[in-house]
């Protein structure tokens, strides 16, 4: 009569392993540690979007600067600034929308991908690895998120993210490719402070 209980225990352990794969955690923690210990990070990113049929929807070049929980993202004339509490999203013309960091939790920004802090928001599993690279799948714990899963390619030698493929709930995909990353960038604190004077005089700000 003990056999069913042995199998039950086995499957419970297997389920737990699949939710938080220890092998994947080691790799992810190395990314997080490198980001946490950095005083400034400068990243060049390429984002390629495709619809559910695989048709390319566009390519964007993005510059991202990070310092702790603050970041400044620029794509063409558009900007996103986060001072750690408030996110300012400039449309490149004359409008800024403001939101709290907590309000942005349903989306997955490049900053969140690169931060390496996955434990709180994801289950994860190691899909494949070589001596130099690892493929890790992230599944959001909160099913209200705007995406189904994220597939990471990690450079194990550099302990850095190489790319991330994000699949949304409509089966559209976005490939985020890290072109270059500098973990020792010197970034001034005022870069992450909102400065009304740098924007057009007719700027409108919406909460």
What residue spans do the PLM features occupy?
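Short beta-strand-initiation
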Residues: 59, 68, 75, 119, ...
